Amino acid sequence: MVRQGIDRRYLSSIILLQESAKTAQKAQDMKQLVFERINSGGVKLEPQETRNALYNGPMNELCANLARNKYLCALFRIPNEESYSLLDDEQELPDVAERVEKELENNSLYRTMYDVELVLRFFAIRNLEGYQNQFSDFLDKYLIYANKFSSETLKKLSSLFSDTIFFAYQLLGENAFFLWRYRRTKSGSKWGWFTRSTTTVYDPLMFVLSEFLDQKECLLSTVKAIREDLKPFYQKNYDVFEGRNSNRSDIEKRITLYREFFKKYLED
């Protein structure tokens, strides 16, 4: 069943067919056919909207629930009652719930279920060896596979995501997934922060931070130095981070660079 309690684009809801298929495979084939026809005309569904209806299951539901994590929402500027207090200490409006509801309607990450995909990406990249062709296909296959995980495994993965996104917020602040980039403009060229979170940073950084959870306190004790060193880190390795390339090789290179970057603070 499509994620309950969440009013996303109406196409994600009308796919709830009263199927008469005799087998699970037949039901899946029918869903796939419906989506192919819908996507060939009218409003085209985004990848995660399609996954949400075609491949719903325990892992998909977990991703949907974790997408409302207050730290993820704060870092990607997705409206959330709890995350408002992280971004604005003065946010104590009595109508905050109503405000969040209205803002969610206009938030593209939420409306297209990209927030749910962000969580799925975190889990899938832990199995990067399965990424062979298109990234979207990789996510599809991982979700199908992960929907079969035991409840105990899902519980552990849930804690891993929650602990890692909190660590990212603690260590690098609300702009943890911003990229320090080089820009050429008519008035000249300069370095500056790309002022929104990007998966170019999110994907490899979250992977590496999850590896360092056991050394979390040591890294947090050097938070000032780490934040100051990020700019020269990105400048030195900009050829690896520029652009939107996200093939397996790109992600692996970024993971290696982040891993080496954080290791030096544990060796001092």
Task: For each feature predicted by the language model, list its residue ranges.
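Basic- and aromatic-enriched surface patches that contact anionic nucleotides/nucleic acids
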Residues: 1-130, 140, 235, 239-246
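C-terminal subdomains that position terminal phosphate/3'-OH groups for nucleotidyl transfer/ligation
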Residues: 112-268
